[in-house]
């Protein structure tokens, strides 16, 4: 089902872009603030800006991240990012609802909650069931293993921003019976948060036109960028795919905004990667336990460019890595020797956090369905541990995550006894040897 939907999206992408012209994206704020529609000199996509910059703001188009080392106030940790984002919208008429499980038990087409809108598909979006509030916000943990050949997983630790589980700040309004709001109000709120909370100047904000689809629905979207980072995607859900390969208009128009909550924290801290901002004391413990240290000056220069290494977006990843190394004035092999162990810790911390959330919500590593994906990341974490001879106590690591996360997501405590009972770290030696080969392949 996911493959069929992905195929439909690819087929319709260009057609939909033609359908959604300038008039589909121009909101009142653009007119009032003097935003102009331009075509990016790098990717040729259309975007809106108040500056004379010829680039859309996407990481690869502007040459990397431009906010590294630029702390905003005291910076927000993971918990502060969730709270401050929710508080902003609650003060502006939104109701915060409890997040849904990451294991999508109410869906028969996907194993995991992949976006906050998943919580409301298909029944709320189709008007069959009333939304729990309107408008609403939900700090929804999401799991994604997508990409060609698990490339999303391969990106973890390398691009500085990829996570297999992330918290999507879902901002939703359902337009019916005079309730909800539409594009103008959506971008008003969006721009206010970016400029007042994240302290971006007007000229630093750009909105890139695109089309987003997921869960059988789609619509035009405006991706908001600041200093080389996509912070939020504003989707204006208006259509549904049909069984005969076409599409129809939805009776209820839905504001489907997905904020990258971990990205917000990363942006405010200006830390080298999203992992320092997200995992906090857990990553500190990992570094202390393994003795991994790194050239901070090299790491600082590298992470600015690391966003250019997205496996899904680069035709030749080896060449891209060589190019990054060349810009840093270092051989690719030496760069890997310097940063490889740290990138492995990033991946291990990500994968184990994902497992904690999934297991707390009833997911178990196995050979079938979504459980197979969980097994993949478990094996990859164990493999990287073996490859670099970290000798980590994984049971302790899982409990470190639980202790840190429970401040905001108390339900992760449910994973504690299950992890102990499953003995997840007791894997046979032949399997571990195969896993080491897998880890080497992924490097």
Model-predicted regions and their roles:
Residues 425-429, 433-443:
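Single conserved hydrophobic/aromatic residue that forms the stacking wall/gate
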Residues 40-43, 56:
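Short cysteine-rich clusters marking metal-coordination/redox-active sites
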Residues 6-31:
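Short, intrinsically disordered terminal segments enriched in charged and Pro/Gly residues
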Residues 27-35, 46-50:
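Short, flexible, mixed-charge glycine/proline-rich loop motifs
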Residues 381:
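Aromatic/basic-lined ligand-recognition segments
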Residues 66-376, 385-401, 410, 414, ...:
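Structured aminoacyl-transfer and RNA-binding surfaces used for tRNA recognition/handling
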Residues 51-64:
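Cysteine-rich micro-motifs
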């Amino acid at each position: 089902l996911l493959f069929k939907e992905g195929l439909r999206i690819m087929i319709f992408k260009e057609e939909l872009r033609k359908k959604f012209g300038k008039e589909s994206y121009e909101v009142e704020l653009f007119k009032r603030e003097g935003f102009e529609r331009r075509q990016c000199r790098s990717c040729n996509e259309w975007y809106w800006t108040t500056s004379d910059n010829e680039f859309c703001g996407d990481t690869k188009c502007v040459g990397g991240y431009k906010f590294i080392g630029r702390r905003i106030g005291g910076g927000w940790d993971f918990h502060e990012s969730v709270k401050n984002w929710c508080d902003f919208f609650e003060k502006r008429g939104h109701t915060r609802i409890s997040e849904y499980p990451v294991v999508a038990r109410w869906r028969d087409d996907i194993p995991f909650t992949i976006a906050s809108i998943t919580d409301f598909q298909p029944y709320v979006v189709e008007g069959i069931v009333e939304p729990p509030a309107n408008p609403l916000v939900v700090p929804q943990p999401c799991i994604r293993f997508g990409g060609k050949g698990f490339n999303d997983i391969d990106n973890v630790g390398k691009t500085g921003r990829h996570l297999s589980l992330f918290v999507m700040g879902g901002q939703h309004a359902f337009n019916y019976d005079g309730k909800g709001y539409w594009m103008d109000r959506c971008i008003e709120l969006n721009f206010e948060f970016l400029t007042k909370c994240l302290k971006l100047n007007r000229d630093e904000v750009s909105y890139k036109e695109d089309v987003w689809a997921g869960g059988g629905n789609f619509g035009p979207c405006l991706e908001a960028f600041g200093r080389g980072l996509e912070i939020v995607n504003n989707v204006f859900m208006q259509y549904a795919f049909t069984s005969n390969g076409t599409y129809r208009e939805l009776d209820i128009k839905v504001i489907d905004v997905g904020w990258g909550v971990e990205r917000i924290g990363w942006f405010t801290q200006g830390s080298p990667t999203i992992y320092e901002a997200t995992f906090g004391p857990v990553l500190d413990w990992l570094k202390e336990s393994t003795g991994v240290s790194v050239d901070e000056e090299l790491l600082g220069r590298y992470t600015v460019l690391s966003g250019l290494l997205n496996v899904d977006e680069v035709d030749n990843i080896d060449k891209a890595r060589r190019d990054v190394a060349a810009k840093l004035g270092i051989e690719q092999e030496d760069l890997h020797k310097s940063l490889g162990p740290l990138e492995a810790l990033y991946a291990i911390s990500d994968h184990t956090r994902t497992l904690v959330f999934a297991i707390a919500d009833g997911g178990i590593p196995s050979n079938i369905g979504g459980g197979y994906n969980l097994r993949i990341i478990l094996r990859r974490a164990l493999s990287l541990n073996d490859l670099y001879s970290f000798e980590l106590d994984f049971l302790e690591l899982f409990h470190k995550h639980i202790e840190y996360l429970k401040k905001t997501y108390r339900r992760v405590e449910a994973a504690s006894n299950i992890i102990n009972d499953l003995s997840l770290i007791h894997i046979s030696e032949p399997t571990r040897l195969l896993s080491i080969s897998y880890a080497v392949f992924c490097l």
